[in-house]
Amino acid sequence: MRMFILDNSHGCDTPGKRSPVWEDGSYLQEWKYCRAIVKKIAQGLKEAGIPNHILVPEDHDIPLRTRVQRANKIAAQYGISQTLLISIHLNAAQQTNTASGWEVHTSPGETKSDEYARVFWETAKDLLGDKFPMRGDWEDGNPDRDSNFAIIRDTACPAILTENLFMDSEKDCRFLMSEEGEQTIVDIHVKSIVKLWLSKI
């Protein structure tokens, strides 16, 4: 693996991508949180000597087609099989406090991305422990969920999408907003990427 592309979810102008306002007035905005997380991941990888690229440095939303084009251009430069895109998100349910936990998604079918997703899954399971459910889909023998998201479907290189707990679950959200929670989400990604960098997967 020669390059890791970090995609930081939605932009500041995408409506509805935030937690409820909790009783103490606190809340979380997905675009701002994920950008902060991605910057910390990028710094951690830089310190480890691992090449990475932040796909969307802008705060505003960039169309999926443009994001895919950017990713494919980078993959063409470093080699499609030697590039991995990681799209980092926060999850949300239909109703407040009805879901909790961590997920990883890949495009439908059996692909190389499934192997990479399993590394992230195992790291998340180790770091989140018994605090939160690990929401896997084991129908095909892998824990990743097959999803038709454009950012993982249309990229030429392997790609995964992580859903890092539910921002509309108060328990999940308060953990995400804590120093421990923020560092845990960073560590899930940095440690997983380091494993892939050092492995022959």
In which residue ranges do the predicted regions lie?
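Short glycine-rich His-centered loop
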Residues: M1-Y27
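Active-site-proximal helix/loop segments of hydrolytic enzymes
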Residues: R2-F4, W31-I201
